[in-house]
């Protein structure tokens, strides 16, 4: 039997999708699959896909003829092409036009837009969903959305990511000292600084807990177009919040926190939630998307956009060490029941085999 050849296509490369592709590439290569990763060069510099044994081809995140032609050339000879995200799937569908190569799309996250942009987003969702032979989604609500948008075959496929490396208690002490939270509670949030991640609501909540003694420090790791607006609010309102930008070793910073906070408008299998529960860090998150089915009873859930409920929950947990300890243990137990990387890779490989077999002979590429 000839070696299965796959191409993984990434667009902008969010942390979750990029980590997933890195994990997937390593696991597939270990199982004898030939893997090519197509992504913008900056994504490879951050995730080093060649270290997994995959071949890397730089393809810009554009839909102009040159970029589509480069992607089409990269997909020559592939048995299955797997696009990660809406934009990547739409561009890949263009690149595969006229070829009988099955396209798999993992719909990693839900996007939001208003007015004319909403119409454009709906069109993109329909094109991507209908172009794919199989749509994989990490949460039930995304499976439902894919079907609404016309997907021929949409399946629930929880995405497992590699567990973060931990430096232990010494590393946690160093992290707290670096952040200025040695003698005060440390709250940690991670994500791109864009509206749907809800950091404006988080700043509203910080106005409440700044009355505590000692005052908790909220640290937000990430970059994005809202940084200047958030920084301006932090300065003008004198909020106990620090924006630290994109950082290596965020897992170590998270492990040092007293609480992890996830205020998003929507999340699937949130990378922050997974890392927090695995590390035994109590999590306060919004009850949106795939979060409730991911965390079960092992986290405190609040409504999206309700700063008062978020602040009240944080204040209560900071004053209740026993409840934080219970949540930490419940988180570890919940995480132990999640699909492993091996489970995820085996499931994806079974989809590839299913799609590639009917086309194994007599196909013109």
Set out the residue ranges of the language-model regions.
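Aromatic "clamp/platform" in nucleotide-sugar-dependent glycosyltransferases that forms part
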Residues: 246, 265
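A conserved mid-protein helix/loop that constitutes part of the nucleotide-sugar donor-binding site
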Residues: 15-26, 185, 189-208, 225-231, ...
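Short hydrophobic beta-strand element within catalytic cores of glycosyltransferases
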Residues: 282-285
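Short His-centered aromatic/hydrophobic patch
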Residues: 83-90, 107-110
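Conserved acidic donor-binding segment of nucleotide-sugar-dependent glycosyltransferases
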Residues: 297-308, 316-321
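A short, active-site helix/loop in glycosyltransferases that binds the activated sugar's phosphate group
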Residues: 130-155
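A short, well-ordered alpha-helix in the C-terminal region of glycosyltransferases
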Residues: 323-338, 347
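N-terminal strand-loop element at the rim of the active site
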Residues: 3-4, 8-66, 142-147, 225
């Amino acid at each position: 039997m000839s070696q299965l050849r796959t191409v993984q296509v990434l667009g902008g490369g969010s942390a979750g999708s990029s980590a997933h592709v890195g994990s997937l590439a390593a696991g597939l290569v270990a199982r004898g699959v030939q893997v090519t990763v197509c992504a913008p060069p900056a994504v490879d510099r951050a995730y080093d896909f060649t270290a997994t044994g995959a071949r890397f081809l730089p393809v810009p995140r554009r839909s102009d003829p040159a970029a589509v032609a480069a992607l089409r050339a990269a997909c020559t000879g592939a048995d299955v092409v797997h696009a990660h995200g809406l934009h990547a799937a739409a561009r890949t569908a263009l690149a595969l036009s006229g070829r009988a190569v099955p396209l798999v799309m993992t719909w990693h996250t839900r996007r939001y837009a208003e007015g004319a942009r909403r119409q454009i987003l709906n069109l993109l969702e329909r094109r991507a969903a209908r172009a794919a032979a199989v749509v994989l989604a990490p949460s039930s609500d995304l499976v439902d959305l894919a079907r609404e948008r016309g997907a021929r075959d949409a399946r629930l496929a929880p995405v497992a990511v590699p567990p973060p490396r931990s430096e232990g208690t010494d590393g946690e002490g160093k992290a707290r000292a670096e952040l200025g939270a040695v003698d005060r509670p440390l709250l940690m949030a991670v994500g791109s600084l864009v509206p749907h991640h809800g950091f404006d609501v988080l700043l509203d909540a910080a106005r409440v807990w700044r009355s505590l003694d000692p005052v908790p420090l909220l640290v937000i790791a990430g970059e994005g177009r809202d940084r200047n607006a958030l920084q301006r609010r932090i300065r003008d309102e004198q909020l106990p919040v620090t924006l630290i930008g994109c950082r290596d070793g965020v897992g170590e910073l998270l492990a040092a926190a007293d609480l992890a906070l996830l205020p998003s408008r929507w999340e699937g299998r949130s990378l922050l939630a997974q890392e927090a529960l695995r590390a035994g860090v109590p999590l306060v998150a919004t009850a949106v998307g795939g979060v409730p089915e991911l965390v079960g009873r092992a986290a405190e859930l609040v409504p999206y956009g309700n700063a008062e409920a978020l602040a009240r929950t944080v204040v209560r947990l900071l004053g209740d060490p026993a409840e934080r300890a219970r949540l930490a243990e419940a988180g570890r137990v919940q995480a132990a029941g999640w699909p492993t990387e091996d489970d995820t890779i085996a499931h994806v490989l079974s989809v590839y085999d299913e799609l590639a077999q009917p086309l194994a002979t007599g196909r013109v590429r």
